Structures are given as C-alpha cells and as structure tokens.
Amino acid sequence: MVKAAVTGAAGRMGARIISVIGDTEGIELVGAIEHSEHYALGQDAGEVAGVGKLGIEISSDVDAVVKKADVLIDFTFPDVTIENLAVVSKHKKSAVIGSTGFSGAEMEEVKKIASNISCIIAPNMSIGVNLMLKLVAEAARTLGDDFDIEMVETHHKLKKDAPSGTAMKLAEVAADAVGRNLSEVGVFERFGMTGARGKKEIGVQTLRGGDVVGDHTVYFYGTGERLEITHRATSRDTFATGAVKGALWISGKAPGLYDMQDVLGLK
C-alpha cells in the first residue's frame, strides 16, 4: 500500500486528489498539508474535501507529514514546491509535482533535488494531454517547415501563470520536433504592425475567463489545409487521476526526474 500526502489539501486540486485516492486501490492518504495561515488547519481533510471524515487533520508541518508518507503529491507554486522537495529529499521519499510556472533557475533547482529522489514533474497529469504531446511531436516532424505552428490555450480567470505550463510543453515538443529553439522562435504576443509572420515562428496565445478547466489546441497551417489537435478538460478529476496514477508508479523507482510520458509508457 502506497502512503500518500497531499499539499494544498483544502484547494480545488487537493480536494479532488484526496477524493481520487479514496477511490483507488493500492494507495491511502496519510497526510494533508496547507500553509501556516490557512483557515482549514486542524480540520479533517476528508470533510474539507467533501468525501466524509477520514481522521486526518490538515497540517502545516511539512516535515512531520512527509516523514510518514511514501510519496508527496504537490500542486502548489514553484517556490513552495522547491521547499517541499527539499523536505522530500531529506527523508528520501518520492514526489509527484503538478505545479507550473517554474523559471529556468527554479527548474535547475528541481533537477538538482531530483537527483537524490524519484520525482515525477509534469505540467499536466491528464492522460489525454500526454498522448496529445506525442501526437503533436509526430505531426510536427511529419509536416516540417511547410506548415506554420500556432497554439491557443484557455483557462479559468483565477489562473496565475501564462501561458499555461501545458501550452509551454506543447510548444517545446513541437519546436524540438522541427529542430528549433523555442526561446528563439516563440511568439507570445502580437499587437500592432507586426509585419508578416516569420517562417520559423511558433505562436502561443493565452485566453482567460470564467471557470474553464483547461483547453489546448495546436494548429498546423499549410497551403489549402490545416490540422488541429485539441484537448479539452471538463473536470479536475482528469488531473487528479493522473497524479494518483503517477504516485502509484513512482513509489520504489530509482532516483531521477520522470514525467507522465514515463508513467504511461509513451516514450
């Protein structure tokens, strides 16, 4: 039985992860974490998540919670995630990271810590999105420079980072497939007299509004035709289910940085 702890336990994602853990064989919740000033501290994690009393209080003591778990599932923010990973490393546990918005320096810190532990990090835990990554790479390789690559992502109005981590990963995968460096060819804003589109450009545009869970579309524009690859998430359970699948998979794995492509056998 894999023993899991969940950060952001009173949040939207944390609550869904706790619910999915309760419905999944082979894994159990042993700890729930929130920040030190959160209103839900001391409350039962199951009751806060809407799944009934579990006998597990929400705590801000990351060290104590991680110590009794096998794997930490973390959907927070980059700086918080790095602090939590340091605790995971201290206790030689495993981690599943769904946080997004990491800077280059922060990702280097994550990689450094992950050299000591087994850790999954993925901007999107959805099975469908991870299959989409593979399809986008294959389409980009096949269509090559004859097709223009653009993408649009939409999320709810409360999302803090833009573009989404998923959109950035899709853009990176497409760029790699056609031998380009996204940092050189990525276009994240167009306004005014921009001139003709550059042949090597990869456009990534962001929309925010309402309660959209997450929509991503990658467009391949050719002459006289276009290909669209779209994924729409209608429930956070798709991410929670992937995270729990990852937690089951990562337990006992050798130290290193993995992603959902590894979990799903898509590499």
Predicted regions mapped to residue ranges:
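C-terminal substrate-binding/catalytic lobe of Rossmann-fold NAD(P)-dependent oxidoreductases
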Residues: 7, 12-63, 144-267
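Extreme N-terminal starter segment of soluble prokaryotic enzymes
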Residues: 1-4
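Residue-level detector of anion-binding/catalytic polar loops
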Residues: 71, 94, 118, 148, ...
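Short, ordered loop/turn segments at secondary-structure junctions
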Residues: 35, 100-102, 124-126, 154-156
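Rossmann-like NAD(P)-binding element
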Residues: 63-83, 89, 93-94
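Rossmann-fold NAD(P)-binding glycine/threonine-rich loop
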Residues: 82-91, 98-121, 130-139
